[in-house]
Amino acid sequence: MANIKSAKKRALQSEKRRQHNASRRSMTRTYLKKVIAAIASGDKAAATAAFAVAQPIMDRMATKGLIHKNKAARHKSRLSAQIKAMA
């Protein structure tokens, strides 16, 4: 454990930030799973609706630095391609 006052403060801030990021990451994964489940069920309307909700969340997480912007772009691109491939 830290002995210096500033190090103690940084440790507290780091833990608080870690918990906040964990909840955001969990939320992002949940929305992605909803899109994937809708694609798997074959319901294009539901998949499109779920993707419309998940897309800005992915962008926001990339902007905040929670995930890399290329990872967000990759997820969006692949999900969009899967939805377009549905007949």
From Swiss-Prot:
Pfam families: Ribosomal_S20p
Gene3D superfamilies: Ribosomal protein S20
Tagged with keyword Ribonucleoprotein: yes
Keyword Cell inner membrane in annotation: no
Renumbered residue ranges of the record's region Disordered: 1-27
SUPFAM superfamilies registered for this protein in UniProt: Ribosomal protein S20
Keywords, sorted A to Z: Ribonucleoprotein, Ribosomal protein, RNA-binding, rRNA-binding
Record's GO cellular component terms: cytosol; small ribosomal subunit
Entry's family note: Belongs to the bacterial ribosomal protein bS20 family.
HAMAP family: Ribosomal_bS20
Function: Binds directly to 16S ribosomal RNA.
Protein name: Small ribosomal subunit protein bS20
Organism of origin: Aeromonas hydrophila subsp. hydrophila (strain ATCC 7966 / DSM 30187 / BCRC 13018 / CCUG 14551 / JCM 1027 / KCTC 2358 / NCIMB 9240 / NCTC 8049)
Primary gene name: rpsT
